[in-house]
């Protein structure tokens, strides 16, 4: 059993015959690895969980991040963002390969990976950083490529294309950063006719380099994943949207408060 005042929002990650799950946030935060067929626990890693937020407790910390599994050089690494740090585990044994300090207490989105770099970001005006993967032990001094101590509040996860990281912030601003330097290339506000531009959802990147996003005002945006911002379309569904857009078989699925939408060619 797990409880946090803001709820839980992580998803299981399936890789081969294994399932990985960040069971948190909450007092019993644990990263689990299960056998996909039997449900047997193969290994588990415990992380400090903080308070649940009930009864006036204010030690609010936690990670809503999903782990991601990537090939980094000669090995696979299970990459994870936690309060205070980013880290990597051996997906077979659960052994911690490396850790890098720098994140703040609240981690809302999942890490992303490209070109040997893990991009990890805190929420609530916290820090962001890039880490060279493939290390061992505490790599804060050696492998932390860049570090920004305070960035805009973001809840949804970003995407990477051609050496640039794109994310839609809580306030409805599209950010683009160079993944090797952390330099902010652009930040552009996107706003439709909906009553609010606030955003909690993650971006979706298509194979042809287009980003799709939806905000809480029910506005959906399509823009190019290029270092020069180009908004291609804005469409309003007329209802509140909090969840991220899902993609399957060439179709977009959007869950609103009233309807489930499917967008694609007939």
PLM region descriptions:
Residues 1-266:
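Noncatalytic, solvent-exposed loop/strand surfaces
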């Amino acid at each position: 059993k797990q409880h946090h005042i803001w709820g839980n929002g992580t998803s299981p990650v399936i890789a081969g015959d294994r399932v990985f799950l960040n069971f948190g946030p909450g007092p019993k935060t644990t990263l689990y690895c299960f056998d996909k067929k039997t449900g047997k626990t193969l290994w588990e890693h415990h992380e400090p969980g903080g308070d649940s937020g009930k009864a006036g407790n204010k030690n609010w910390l936690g990670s809503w991040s999903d782990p991601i599994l990537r090939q980094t050089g000669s090995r696979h690494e299970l990459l994870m963002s936690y309060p205070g740090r980013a880290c990597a585990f051996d997906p077979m044994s659960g052994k911690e390969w490396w850790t890098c300090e720098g994140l703040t207490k609240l981690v809302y989105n999942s890490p992303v990976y490209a070109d040997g770099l893990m991009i990890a970001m805190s929420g609530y005006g916290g820090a962001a950083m890039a880490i060279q993967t493939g290390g061992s032990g505490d790599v804060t001094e050696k492998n932390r490529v860049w570090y920004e101590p305070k960035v805009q509040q973001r809840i949804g996860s970003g995407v990477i294309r051609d050496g640039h990281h794109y994310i839609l912030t809580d306030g409805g601003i599209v950010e683009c950063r160079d993944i090797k330097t952390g330099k902010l290339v652009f930040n552009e506000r996107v706003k439709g006719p909906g009553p609010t531009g606030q955003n909690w959802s993650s971006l979706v990147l298509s194979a042809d380099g287009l980003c799709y996003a939806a905000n809480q005002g029910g506005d959906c945006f399509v823009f190019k994943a290029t270092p020069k911002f180009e908004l291609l379309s804005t469409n309003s569904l007329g209802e509140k949207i909090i969840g991220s857009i899902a993609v399957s078989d060439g179709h977009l699925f959007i869950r609103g408060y009233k309807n489930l939408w499917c967008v694609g060619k007939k």
